Amino acid sequence: MLRETGVMNIECPATMRRHVQKVLGGEYEVPYRATRPVILDIGTNVGSFAAWALKRWPAAHVHCYEPLPNNFALLKKNPGSLEGQSISLNNFAIGDPSLKNLYLGRNNCGEASFYDVGEQLPATVEVETRAPSVLPKAHIMKMDTEGSEIDILSRMPSIDFDVVMLEYHSEANRRKIDELLADFFLVGGEIRSLHRGTLKYFHGRLVKAAGLLVPRRVG
């Protein structure tokens, strides 16, 4: 196990070190200025995003959702030590409630998934999955669910966050995500490789309020 320095120490397996450092370094940075945002961290893993978010928005409250038992144990040691103050911990998945068997990651504990997207082992762990209707209202939603993004977005009664940040794990899912987030504008992200990347969206009302609905003339 290694410990990374951010808003607090993050304990993680050595195979997660690079990923934790990237998140703590601002992978999910967006120019969102709310002072007390409620944040959903779906696919919390060991807690690096939650730790970064509490440094970025110190008065925020982060609701964490992590189904994998070993990850959840580390989460409780990391930002989960603030449970009841700035953090709420939930040891279940969000998505299709019929899905119970989570494939373990082939390379690290961040690759656990209900789907084989090329980075999973045959071994599975049985977990609990709840529908997105259990989620509280929030300003920001971050998702890193290794292929369950469409399961989650398509089951939401409404998608009314100010900010949505998520990873995608196939080109087909990326295009579907764009359809489901029709009221949002893509404001940032990173394409790491074919079928893999991070996307950041602002709701159209924020873009309209900033006077940016009409593209600026270049040249």
Regions found by a protein language model. Name each.
Residues 1-219:
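Phosphate/nucleotide-binding beta-alpha loop and adjacent structural elements of enzyme active sites
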